[in-house]
Amino acid sequence: MFEGYPVDTANTAGDQAVTNYTINFGPQHPAAHGVLRMVMELDGEIIERVDPHVGLLHRGTEKLIEYKTYLQALPYFDRLDYCSPLGMEHSYVLAIEKLLDLEVPARAQYLRTMFAELTRICNHMLNIGSHVMDVGAMTPNLWVFELREDCLNFFERASGARMHSAYFRPGGVHQDVPEKLLVDIGEWVETRLPKLFGDAMSLVIDNRIFKQRNVDIATVSKEDALAWGFSGPMIRGSGIAWDLRKSQPYDAYAAMEFDIPVGTRGDCYDRFMVRVEEVYQSAKIIKQCLRDMPTGPIASLDRKVVPPKRGEMKQSMESLIHHFKLYTEGFHVPAGEVYVATESPKGEFGVYLVSDGTNKPYRCKIRPTAFSHLQAMDMMSKGHMLADTTAIIGAIDVVFGECDR
C-alpha cells in the first residue's frame, strides 16, 4: 500500500510525538466552588502544572470600607465568606474593641462563642456535603444540608437574617436571644445533630470509593504546610495542632474545653476527617456555652459606642438624638493600628485595622484564609489525575467572596 512512499518515522504520530496540552478549568466549572479559573497543563490525564487565576470576584471591599463608619463597614464582612458570615464579623469587631480598649460583658462573649461555633458547623456542613458530592455521592449532601438549614434558622431567630446577620457588634452583640432559642439549640446539639450527621457520615467515612478518591491525594507535609502559610483544617490535616482558639484565646474560648483534631498523612481524606471531627468539637463547645451562659447585659455600657435601647428612645428625646448621631456620624476610634486574627471555619482570618482618630478606618487590610491555600494548588496537584482536582479543591474549602475581597 505504501510502496514507493518513504515513511518519515521521526514525525510519526506516536508516543514520542504527543506533547502536553493546556486546558482551562473554570471559571464556570461547578466543582470550582465559585469563580476560580485554573490554567492546567496536562500530560494525558496527569497534571503537570496548575496556574490559578483569582480575582474574578474582586469588589474592592477594602477600599469601600475606608469610606464607611466603623459600624457601616460591618456588613461588608458578612459578604466576604458568605458561607460563614459570623466568622468574618468576629475578627473585625474584636479589632475595633482592641483599638477602643472596650470591655465586652460575659454574656455577650458566651453568645459570640456559641454562634461562632454554630457558624463553624454551618460552614462544615456545606463543605462536607459538596466535597462528597463532587466525588460522586449524592445522599449525604441532602442530609447534611438539613442540618445547615437548622443553623440558618437559628441565625434568623437571633438576628432576623439567615445569612448576612450583622449580629456581632463592637461592644457585644446586637440583641439578646429568646430563652426558647437557647433551649432549642441545646436539644438540637444533643439529639438531631449527632443522629443525622452520624447517619450521613456512616455512608462516607469507610466507603471504599470515597477513600480511593481522597486517600493519598494532595499530600502535604508539616514542613510544606508551614512554608505555604496554611491554617485551619489545612494545617491540622497535615498533623500540626495549631488552633487560634487554643493558642490565642478570645471571647469565652479560654473557659472552653475541647480537643484539636489533627491528621496523620496530610491528604484530602485527613482534611475531610478533621472537619468531621470539628463538628463534634463545636457541639461540645456549644453545650458548655449553654451550660455556663451568664446573665447580664449583652453589650458594653460605654454609651459612646453602643446605642441606647429601643425602649429608652421611645421615652427620651436625648436617647433618640444619641441613637441618630451614633448611626449617622458613628463613633471616633483612637489613632493606632491593630491586627486581630480569629479561627474562622476555613482557617486564620485576620483583620489589620489602622485608625487615624476619625470615625472611619484609615485602612483595613483583610487576611483571607483561602488565598494562601490556593497558591499551593500547583504543588498539591502535580502528578495527580485531572479527576482528582475536584477532590483537592473540595478539601481546601474555598469561597471567593473572601479570597478575592
Swiss-Prot record:
This is NADH-quinone oxidoreductase subunit D. NDH-1 shuttles electrons from NADH, via FMN and iron-sulfur (Fe-S) centers, to quinones in the respiratory chain. The immediate electron acceptor for the enzyme in this species is believed to be ubiquinone. Couples the redox reaction to proton translocation (for every two electrons transferred, four hydrogen ions are translocated across the cytoplasmic membrane), and thus conserves the redox energy in a proton gradient. It is found in: Cell inner membrane. Its EC number is 7.1.1.-. GO terms for cellular component: plasma membrane. Keywords: Cell inner membrane, Cell membrane, Membrane, NAD, Quinone, Translocase, Transport, Ubiquinone. Pfam families: Complex1_49kDa. PROSITE patterns: COMPLEX1_49K. NDH-1 is composed of 14 different subunits. Subunits NuoB, C, D, E, F, and G constitute the peripheral sector of the complex. Belongs to the complex I 49 kDa subunit family. It is a peripheral membrane protein. One of its GO terms (molecular function) is NADH:ubiquinone reductase (non-electrogenic) activity. It catalyses: a quinone + NADH + 5 H(+)(in) = a quinol + NAD(+) + 4 H(+)(out). It comes from the Bacteria.
